[in-house]
């Protein structure tokens, strides 16, 4: 076997076989071609690898965005389906215990509306008087000796009268407040100050009497009742003092006569007593007006 192998090698590396081998230039050309092919293959592999890497990077970025979006959508659904209904139930449960009844709400609204002090304007107070004057016409004016226009009369009454503001509150009226209001109304009247004074030179004005509201009439009546009671008490005291001093003749108490102008029977004792009571009443009325101006209250 060894002999056969050596014989083959000798044949292969013999001089004749060596001549048949290619030249070295042709070998170098083949090497260049092989290197170019290898470079092209490597370049194609690198280009493909770069493309794969870029696509993988974009895929990973999109995957991260999709995950974040999925989390946001899940959170939104959880808030809409779980959190908001739970919060609504909790708030309804809490407010149901604190919610007042309908009667309580109506009572509170009524208290708020009634406890607000309001001022009534003069235009509202004179609206009925203007309608009454327009309905009556000129007969209403000539019956009281008036020939001027109703608009001028309304303006004069608005300037002359000063109504006190009152509040629409329940149980706000008391005897002292009524007395104070009556004193203010008597002070606001033009002919109320010198009604019982005989020595005054001013003439009473009665043009504004028809424009006064009904409340003033009731207050003036109470004031007249109070003055009559005071007059009766003063007269009884004067009679007792006159009996003690000897001004009145007789043992029994005499009945006080009227103060009318027709009573012209000369009685010296009664005249003196009347003069004294008139002076006392005048002083009392002056003190009443001063107290009404200063804001004092009489018991």
Swiss-Prot record:
Basic and acidic residues biased stretches: 146-159
Keywords from the UniProt entry: Phosphoprotein
Superkingdom, according to UniProt? Eukaryota
Answer whether the UniProt record assigns the keyword Manganese to this protein: no
Q: Which residues carry this modification: Phosphoserine?
A: 264
Range of residues in the leader sequence: none
**Similarity annotation:** Belongs to the FAM228 family.
Identification of the protein by name: Protein FAM228A
Native organism: Mus musculus (Mouse)
Q: Which gene encodes it?
A: Fam228a
